């Protein structure tokens, strides 16, 4: 049982791959250590294939164990539960660059599991997990056309930083993860503070250049410890079947792909597919199966759509490569919400709603590195009706979580700080129609809904999805892709940003050989499209509303001395509870004495403020107060002049005339005006009624 180790320097960290000792029954297993963040990644491929399967069943599961950070999970069961948002997003991040590297026709089940076992809070486990997945697959003998490398790139003080620490990322203008093979970039996921297209492309190329060190070491590890390659052979292409399908329907299918309206087009394509299957898959000996006929029909669809674009002919819906679909924008579409927008681009439509909340509405996130509170949430819903289908409705799927995070990345750079916007914000994007690029419609709708809610965004933002069709050296970059173009194309390239720069870039490439020239063209064309969309949005709403909705909470903020916090809270929280119940407000007090009062009704907020000021006010010597007599004694009367502050009016200070008995002049409950004569060192207050007059 000999462990084989390989190490290399990767930015400021040393990365070590170890195999041969742990998880030896997996097809491939690697323990990756990057500066004490340790991830065990396994890959298992099954040799048997289910009969009739026509897809590649790859699953990737990334899971974080709380013991990795020396913590015990919360909750009743004290064990990890369903995947967190971070785990779901990282699973997608690993899946996206490895999926296109399995050969066409490979239908064997493959599962990759990455388990975080030790966590250095300065090193995010996502890059080690991606490197581990690449190494495990390279060792497994599976027909994987890798390995891939992965790198995180930051941008600090005008310079790129390889694999920055979590502390450095807080000050970085860029957080970009790039993955690719030795020759080509396959995947980019990034968030930026409105950087130029040149800086973004430079970061992608820098990351690809630096990841070669990881690819080299993975190749060395596979050469030394890899399992024998599977004797899998790609199924032979059935040229006769392809020709038969083309002869049966090519002209009709070409005509169908000129129907601009999605549902009418789909009906025609489905009818043609059924007719061809019925004609060719007869069930007779030697006749092809229905699955094989459908596969050949799908290949014909792809060829027709792609060749039209490469020849410069109109796209499916009649557009050229640069034109964006017609856009309509409406704001304030839902009367009782705090901010709303309806964004429609062709057959893609989103109703986006913004809600303004208080500090107590912030999301408590129990991450592996500890708890934190999230003040801005963006949720994306993709119901089945948006594509004219039926289906399950319930908790969000991986895709919905991924699209929601991408839309959030798109607007994060223009979000105001807490000082400019004291609200906790939740945005929900309801996709009501979908024909490509619904995540970018969510970016546009979010920008509009937040401005409609009166949130002071630094600038409006918009997003656009680009596509690519490439055959040999010929290629065409297409703007604002349809769902069919996404499915049949070679690249999905989403860019969000303001007029001044890029806020998010997501790229998934299905083929080798995407050059810098192609990416430059795609970014330039995306900018052109983004500026066009912003122009349409700005024509309806170009800056935030000056007033928040009448139904949104209004904030009143005041500062009290930290020593006075206990006076506002009261014994067991009784005072603050009474305050919130009696005024109908929500009150949050920070340790530094900042008090935030939230109320939908302005008068209620003013009343709560007045009462807090009374509770925390200092008694001023020489000032006249109106107070209530609370206790009569032989020697005088106690009067409450401020909440919780009583003073004594001595019998000699009640009147200029001689007073025989206090009760002759005062009774409990009387309202009287008194002047403060003295506050002694023990805080006792001496009052006078006769000094008032």
Curated annotation (Swiss-Prot):
Keywords, ordered alphabetically: Cytoplasm, Magnesium, Metal-binding, Nucleotidyltransferase, RNA-binding, Transferase
Superkingdom as given in the UniProt entry: Bacteria
Gene3D superfamilies: GHMP Kinase, N-terminal domain, K Homology domain, type 1, Nucleic acid-binding proteins
InterPro entries per UniProt: ExoRNase_PH_dom1, ExoRNase_PH_dom2, ExoRNase_PH_dom2_sf, KH_dom, KH_dom_type_1, KH_dom_type_1_sf, NA-bd_OB-fold, PNPase
EC class name: transferase
Alphabetical list of CDD domains matching this protein: KH-I_PNPase, RNase_PH_PNPase_1, RNase_PH_PNPase_2, S1_PNPase
Main location: cytoplasm
Domain S1 motif intervals: 622-690
Needed cofactors: Mg(2+)
Residues annotated as domain KH: 553-612
EC id: 2.7.7.8
GO biological process: mRNA catabolic process; RNA processing
Localisation per UniProt entry: Cytoplasm
Reactions catalysed, as given in the entry: RNA(n+1) + phosphate = RNA(n) + a ribonucleoside 5'-diphosphate
Residues annotated to bind Mg(2+): 486, 492
GO molecular function, one term: 3'-5'-RNA exonuclease activity
GO cellular component, one term: cytosol
Family, per entry: Belongs to the polyribonucleotide nucleotidyltransferase family.
Subunit-structure text: Component of the RNA degradosome, which is a multiprotein complex involved in RNA processing and mRNA degradation.
Role according to the record: Involved in mRNA degradation. Catalyzes the phosphorolysis of single-stranded polyribonucleotides processively in the 3'- to 5'-direction.
PANTHER family: POLYRIBONUCLEOTIDE NUCLEOTIDYLTRANSFERASE, POLYRIBONUCLEOTIDE NUCLEOTIDYLTRANSFERASE 1, MITOCHONDRIAL
NCBIfam families membership: polynuc_phos, PRK11824.1
The protein's name in its UniProt record: Polyribonucleotide nucleotidyltransferase
Originating species: Thioalkalivibrio sulfidiphilus (strain HL-EbGR7)
């Amino acid at each position: 049982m000999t462990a084989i180790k390989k190490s290399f320097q990767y930015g400021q960290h040393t990365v070590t791959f170890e195999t041969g000792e742990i998880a030896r029954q997996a097809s491939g297993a690697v323990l990756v250590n990057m500066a004490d963040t340790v991830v065990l990644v396994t890959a298992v491929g099954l040799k048997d294939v289910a009969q009739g399967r026509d897809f590649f069943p790859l699953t990737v599961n990334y899971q974080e164990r709380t013991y990795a950070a020396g913590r015990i999970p919360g909750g009743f069961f004290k064990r990890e539960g369903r995947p967190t948002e971070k785990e779901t997003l990282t699973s997608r991040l690993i899946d996206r660059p490895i999926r296109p590297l399995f050969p066409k026709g490979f239908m064997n089940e493959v599962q990759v599991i990455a388990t975080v076992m030790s966590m250095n809070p300065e090193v995010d486990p996502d890059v080690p997990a991606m490197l581990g997945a690449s190494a495990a697959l390279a060792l497994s003998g599976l027909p994987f056309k890798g390995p891939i490398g992965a790198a995180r790139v930051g941008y600090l003080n005008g310079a790129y930083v390889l694999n920055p620490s979590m502390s450095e990322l807080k000050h970085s203008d860029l957080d970009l993860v790039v993955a690719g093979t030795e020759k080509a970039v396959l995947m980019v996921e990034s968030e930026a503070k409105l950087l130029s297209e040149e800086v973004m492309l430079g970061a992608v190329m820098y990351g690809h250049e630096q990841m070669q060190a990881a690819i080299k070491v993975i190749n060395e590890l596979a050469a030394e410890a890899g399992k024998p390659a599977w004797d899998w052979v790609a199924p032979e292409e059935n040229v006769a079947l392809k020709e038969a399908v083309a002869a049966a329907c090519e002209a009709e299918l070409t005509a169908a792909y000129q129907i601009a309206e999605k549902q009418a087009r789909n009906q025609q394509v489905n009818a043609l597919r059924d007719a061809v299957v019925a004609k060719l898959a007869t069930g007779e000996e030697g006749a092809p199966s229905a699955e094989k006929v459908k596969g050949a029909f799908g290949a014909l669809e792809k060829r027709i759509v792609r060749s039209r674009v490469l020849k410069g002919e109109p796209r499916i819906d009649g557009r050229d490569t640069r034109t964006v679909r017609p856009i309509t924008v409406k704001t304030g579409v839902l009367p009782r919400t705090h901010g709303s927008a309806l964004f429609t681009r062709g057959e893609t439509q989103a109703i986006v709603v913004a809600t303004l909340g208080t500090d107590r509405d912030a999301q408590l996130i129990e991450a592996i590195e500890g708890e934190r509170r999230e003040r801005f949430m963006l949720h994306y819903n993709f119901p089945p009706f948006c594509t004219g289908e039926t289906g399950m409705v319930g908790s969000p799927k991986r895709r919905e979580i991924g699209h929601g995070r991408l839309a959030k990345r798109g607007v994060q750079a223009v979000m105001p700080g807490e000082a400019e916007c004291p609200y906790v914000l939740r945005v929900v994007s309801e996709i009501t129609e979908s024909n490509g690029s619904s995540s970018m419609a969510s970016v546009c709708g979010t920008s509009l809904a937040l401005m409609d809610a009166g949130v002071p965004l630094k600038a409006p933002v918009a997003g656009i999805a680009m596509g690519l069709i490439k055959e040999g050296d010929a290629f065409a970059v297409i703007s604002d892709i349809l769902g069919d173009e996404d499915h049949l194309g070679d690249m999905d390239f989403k860019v969000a940003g303001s007029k001044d720069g890029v806020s998010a870039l997501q790229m998934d490439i299905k083929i080798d050989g995407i050059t810098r020239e192609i990416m430059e063209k795609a970014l330039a064309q995306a900018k052109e499209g983004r500026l066009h969309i912003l122009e349409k949005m700005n024509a309806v709403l170009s800056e935030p509303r000056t007033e928040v909705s009448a139904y949104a909470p209004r904030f009143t903020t005041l500062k009290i001395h930290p020593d006075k916090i206990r006076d506002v809270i009261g014994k067991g929280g009784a005072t603050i509870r009474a305050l919130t119940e009696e005024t109908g407000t929500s009150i949050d007090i920070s340790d530094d004495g900042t008090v935030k009062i939230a109320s939908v009704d302005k008068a209620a907020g003013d009343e709560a403020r007045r009462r807090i000021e009374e509770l925390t006010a200092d008694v001023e010597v020489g000032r006249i107060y109106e107070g209530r007599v609370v206790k009569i004694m032989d020697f005088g009367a106690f009067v409450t002049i401020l909440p919780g502050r009583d003073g004594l009016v001595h019998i000699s200070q009640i009147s200029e005339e001689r007073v025989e008995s206090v009760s002759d002049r005062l009774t409990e409950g009387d309202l009287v005006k008194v002047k403060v004569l003295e506050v002694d060192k023990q805080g006792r207050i001496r009052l006078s009624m006769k000094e008032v007059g």
